[in-house]
A protein has these predicted regions:
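N-terminal active-site wall of soluble small-molecule enzyme domains
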Residues: 1-42
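Active-site-proximal loop/turn and secondary-structure-junction residues that shape catalytic pockets
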Residues: 7-8, 28-30, 49-51, 73-77, ...
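Active-site-proximal beta-alpha loop/turn segments in soluble metabolic enzymes
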Residues: 38, 76-95, 121-136, 162-179
Length: 202
């Protein structure tokens, strides 16, 4: 379950959800947010900025913990949704750009702190209210390519790939939401094919 602040985290915990089942998101996490995530033992912290990597590394060393983290990657894809809720184009505030090399640099920085941070995998989110699979298909292919780059440069095969949510719902009567199982199967096939082509284990 995703939470995006210390407040949302507190609500989730109050509702009886175990910290290990939570992912801490947010592109502007405060020190309080990160400290709350560490204290709750959240399953994963999704990193969105270089400053956040440094902050979390400091807190992890101070507290003697080694949280599992994901790098949020901006993949530069067209999500075919309203521009206000598209989150994977280059000119936006979330994550590290694949095209500029920021994603690769973020991975290097986290791996340099591997005594404090456990890099578990990569995360992407291309937008909300998405009704066609093409954006997800491009995103899946690109992020699997980055997994292969990590293996080739660092000798590490990251175990987790999170392609995010954002599937459209019937918000107005004219909307025709996609079939979730069908879209999941399309993505599974793309990831499996890309992994096979690049020699990555699934």
């Amino acid at each position: 379950i995703d939470v995006c602040s210390a407040g949302e985290l507190a609500c989730a915990l109050r509702a009886g959800i175990c910290g290990a089942q939570l992912l801490m998101h947010g592109n502007n996490k405060s020190m309080d947010d990160l400290e709350a995530a560490l204290s709750a033992g959240v399953g994963y912290i999704v990193l969105d900025s270089f400053e956040e990597i440094a902050r979390l590394g400091f807190l992890a060393e101070r507290d003697g913990v080694r949280p599992r983290v994901l790098i949020r990657v901006t993949l530069g894809v067209e999500a075919h949704t309203h521009e206000f809720i598209a989150t994977a184009h280059e000119d936006q505030k979330f994550g590290f750009s694949l095209a500029t090399g920021d994603a690769a640099e973020a991975i290097r920085r986290v791996l340099a702190l591997q005594d404090r941070l456990e890099l578990a995998g990569l995360h992407s989110h291309i937008g909300s209210q998405i009704f066609v699979s093409s954006g997800f298909e491009v995103a899946a292919a690109r992020i699997v390519g980055l997994l292969a780059d990590v293996r080739d440069e660092h000798g590490v095969e990251l175990p987790l790939l999170n392609l995010g949510g954002g599937l459209g719902i019937k918000y107005v009567s004219a909307d025709e939401p996609p079939d979730v199982a069908q879209m999941a199967e399309v993505l599974r096939e793309i990831v499996a094919r890309q992994c096979a082509n690049l020699g990555l284990a699934i």
